[in-house]
Amino acid sequence: MGKRIDDETLKKIRLPKEGEIFGVVEKMLGNDRVQVRCVDGKTRVARIPGKMRKRVWIREGDVVLVKPWEFQPERADVTWRYTRVQVDWLKRKGKLDERVTKLLEEIIPGA
């Protein structure tokens, strides 16, 4: 059975903090790394931190928040993964950048 999401859960959806940007997972690279296409037009290799490794499963086409490294901007850390329901809610509320929707359609046609 699917999970039921209520309004209170949706209100707790995490929005980007300073230094974080939206991205879409293009490719799983292995060794807890993913290739993410970000809304700023760059493709980064993002690391999945230890606290997310076994708790949050990330797949190709998922919308994620990444925090680029200051000293190596072509790399980043994944800080959050959004579910499909959360992505739909963000689109309806206008919180999700239009560029993310375009990235989703490029990576997964018909998304």
Curated annotation (Swiss-Prot):
Coiled coil: none annotated. Pfam families: eIF-1a. InterPro entries: NA-bd_OB-fold, RNA-binding_domain_S1_IF1, TIF_eIF-1A, TIF_eIF-1A_CS. CDD domains: S1_IF1A. Residues 11-83 form the S1-like domain. It comes from Methanopyrus kandleri (strain AV19 / DSM 6324 / JCM 9639 / NBRC 100938). Belongs to the eIF-1A family. This is Translation initiation factor 1A. One of its GO terms (molecular function) is RNA binding. Seems to be required for maximal rate of protein biosynthesis. Enhances ribosome dissociation into subunits and stabilizes the binding of the initiator Met-tRNA(I) to 40 S ribosomal subunits. Keywords: Initiation factor, Protein biosynthesis. The keyword Hydrolase does not apply. It comes from the Archaea.
